Swiss-Prot record:
SUPFAM superfamilies: WD40 repeat-like. One of its GO terms (biological process) is regulation of DNA repair. Disruption phenotype: Reduced plasmodesmata (PD)-mediated horizontal and vertical cell-to-cell transport in leaves. Involved in the formation of X-, Y-shaped and twinned plasmodesmata (PD), thus modelating PD size exclusion limit and regulating cell-to-cell transport. Cell cycle checkpoint regulator that monitors and responds to DNA damage such as DNA cross-links, and triggers the halt of the cell cycle progression in the presence of DNA cross-linking agents. Mediates the active process of aluminum- (Al) dependent root growth inhibition and thus is required for response to Al toxicity. Essential for signal transduction and development of both male and female organs. Keywords: Cell cycle, Cytoplasm, Developmental protein, DNA damage, Nucleus, Repeat, WD repeat. This is Protein DECREASED SIZE EXCLUSION LIMIT 1. The gene is DSE1. Belongs to the plant DSE1 protein family. The lineage of its organism: Eukaryota, Viridiplantae, Streptophyta, Embryophyta, Tracheophyta. Its main location: cytoplasm. It comes from Nicotiana benthamiana. GO terms for cellular component: cytoplasm; nucleus. Pfam families: WD40 (PF00400).
């Protein structure tokens, strides 16, 4: 049986003068945001494949490490995160950004960990629930004991109409912080510092390298955080206990570089500096994180991961310049996309699941059409 050749990109967006560190699609319009390491934020029309607007939003010395848009923020806002210790929220209207940010959060965090806007389960997610009992891969769970708990509860409706929360690696690089984008206030730290000896664990994990914030329907309004660390471990916090994670697993032998939670909030994907891509399942009743598929690569280094909103396709961005496409349900490889001639930094799917974007150190953004969803 002959294999079909991998497709070429439908378009390549050129305009950045430095490595494109991050990209994200607008939640409802044909717009793509991209941020580069020289501090430039570009807005692209993904129908006409042209720049709509560009602005220098962080200093060239520090650059952008993350751009984020979400239904939680609304249609007219986008967030940029720089290595200058700031997160800025911008108004996006009339084809361009506001001259000044609506709000600036001074996190004093100087690192490469991209922030995460809290998300709720997607209605577009049609993937069948994973049968966790059928997963045979083992995992190690930390015993929490009967410690007093501090909990923060966020209702799903509040995320749309009230406070907007982001998770970010903190001023102490091993600590995850939760911030309210509306007020620029820090509302939680993970772990919550109480001066007890048990709080030594995060430092042993090293720096927080990747983070995802989500609001699973099973959590009764409790925000969950997945954090990947320098030692290859991943911790799941559910904020009922700010001192100790719900569980901690070590699937990787090198620093975790990327995490993505799927639209059902029942599983996800991780990439690291080692040669493995891991698809995992979250059992909310047991508080466990279990491997359901381990993919071993010929060359190490996965800088970015993304899962399509419909839950069918997953993509990874590799140090080897390649974009890899997988069947997310089965974990089977589908294609290797070859366009970029330098490290691929990140990948992102559009909200309608019709486009995939990849960004690279070669200063370009490639747009791909793959396995289009049924309409």
């Amino acid at each position: 049986m002959s294999k079909r050749p991998a497709p070429d990109p439908v378009s390549v967006l050129r305009g950045h003068r430095a490595s494109v560190a991050d990209i994200c699609f607008h939640p409802s319009n044909s717009i793509l945001f991209s941020g580069s390491t020289d501090g430039e934020l570009r807005i692209w029309n993904t129908v006409q494949y042209r720049t709509v607007s560009s602005a220098w939003v962080h200093s060239a010395a520090h650059g952008i490490i993350c751009v984020a848009a979400s239904p939680v923020l609304g249609d007219n806002k986008v967030i940029s995160q720089g290595r200058d210790g700031t997160v800025k929220c911008w108004d996006f209207g009339g084809g361009g950004l506001s001259r000044t940010p609506l709000l600036t959060i001074k996190t004093n965090s100087y690192h490469f960990c991209k922030l995460s806007i809290a998300k709720s389960p997607s209605e577009a997610m049609k993937i069948d629930d994973l049968e966790v009992n059928e997963i045979v891969d083992g995992m190690q769970r930390e015993e929490q004991g009967d410690q007093p708990t501090d909990s923060i509860k966020f209702k799903g409706k509040e995320l749309i109409e009230g406070p907007k929360y982001v998770a970010i690696a903190g001023e102490q690089a091993s600590v995850v912080e939760i911030w309210d984008v509306n007020t620029a206030e820090r509302i939680a730290q993970l772990p919550h510092s109480s001066g007890s000896p048990s709080n030594q664990t995060p430092n042993q994990r090293g720096m927080c390298m990747a983070v995802q914030a989500f609001l699973p329907s099973e959590s009764q309004g409790l925000l969950s955080i997945m954090a990947g660390y320098e030692d290859g471990s991943i911790a799941w916090w559910d904020l009922r206990n700010l001192g100790v994670p719900l569980t901690s697993v070590k699937f990787h032998s090198e620093p975790v570089l990327s995490l993505c939670i799927d639209g059902s909030c029942k599983g996800g994907l991780s990439g690291a500096a080692d040669e493995k891509i891991l698809m995992f399942a979250l059992d909310h009743s047991m508080g466990s994180c279990l491997i359901r598929k381990e993919i071993v690569l010929e060359r190490p280094g996965i800088a970015g991961t993304s899962i399509r909103p419909d839950g069918k396709i997953a993509a990874t961005a590799g140090w080897d310049h390649r974009v890899r496409i997988y069947n997310y349900r089965k974990g089977k490889p589908l294609a290797i996309l070859k366009y970029h001639n330098a490290t691929c930094n990140t990948v992102s799917f559009s909200a309608d699941s019709k486009l995939l974007a990849s960004a690279s150190e070669d200063t370009t953004v490639a747009l791909w059409e793959l396995y289009l969803p049924r309409t």
